[in-house]
């Protein structure tokens, strides 16, 4: 039975690493930028999954968790991205 979301080993490992980053008095620029998205743990869990499996298809649960976090924290509006259909996140907002 496969683990999902916040119960995955990747998520648990990412959460532990995030606790260490928060205690760091001089975090690097990358950690600071990712932390500001509000999705540091979800991002790291996805990276850990891909690094171990080498196959994004095996990381659907981590991807779904990251996507949910990204949207919940308003990052689609803050950062311009391009969707599969070629529209940007800013184009999507204009249509609303």
From Swiss-Prot:
Subcellular location: Mitochondrion inner membrane; Mitochondrion intermembrane space
Cystine pairings recorded for this chain: 39-69, 49-59
Stretches assigned to the CHCH domain: 36-77
One Pfam family, short name: CHCH
UniProt GO BP: mitochondrial cytochrome c oxidase assembly; mitochondrial respiratory chain complex assembly
RNA-binding listed as a keyword: no
Motif (Cx9C motif 2): 59-69
Membrane topology reported for the UniProt record: Peripheral membrane protein
Chief place of localization: mitochondrion
Entry keyword annotation includes Iron-sulfur: no
Cited PROSITE patterns: CHCH (PS51808)
Gene Ontology CC terms, in alphabetical order: cytoplasm; mitochondrial inner membrane; mitochondrial intermembrane space; nucleus
Top-rank lineage group of the source organism: Eukaryota
Record's keyword terms, sorted: Disulfide bond, Membrane, Mitochondrion, Mitochondrion inner membrane, Repeat
Residue window of motif Cx9C motif 1: 39-49
Domain comment in the entry: The twin Cx9C motifs are involved in the recognition by the mitochondrial MIA40-ERV1 disulfide relay system and the subsequent transfer of disulfide bonds by dithiol/disulfide exchange reactions to the newly imported protein.
Miscellaneous section: Present with 907 molecules/cell in log phase SD medium.
Function noted in UniProt: Involved in cytochrome c oxidase assembly or stability.
Family: Belongs to the COA4 family.
Protein known as: Cytochrome oxidase assembly factor 4
Organism whose genome encodes this protein: Saccharomyces cerevisiae (strain ATCC 204508 / S288c) (Baker's yeast)
Lineage: Eukaryota, Fungi, Dikarya, Ascomycota, Saccharomycotina
Gene: COA4
């Amino acid at each position: 039975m496969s683990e999902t979301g916040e119960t995955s080993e990747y998520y648990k490992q990412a959460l532990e690493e995030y606790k260490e980053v928060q205690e760091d008095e001089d975090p690097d620029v990358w950690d600071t930028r990712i932390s500001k998205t509000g999705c540091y743990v979800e991002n790291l869990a996805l990276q850990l999954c891909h690094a171990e499996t080498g196959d994004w298809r095996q990381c659907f649960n981590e991807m779904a968790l990251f996507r949910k976090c990204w949207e919940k924290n308003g990052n689609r509006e803050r950062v311009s991205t391009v969707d599969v259909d070629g529209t940007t996140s800013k184009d999507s907002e204009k249509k609303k």
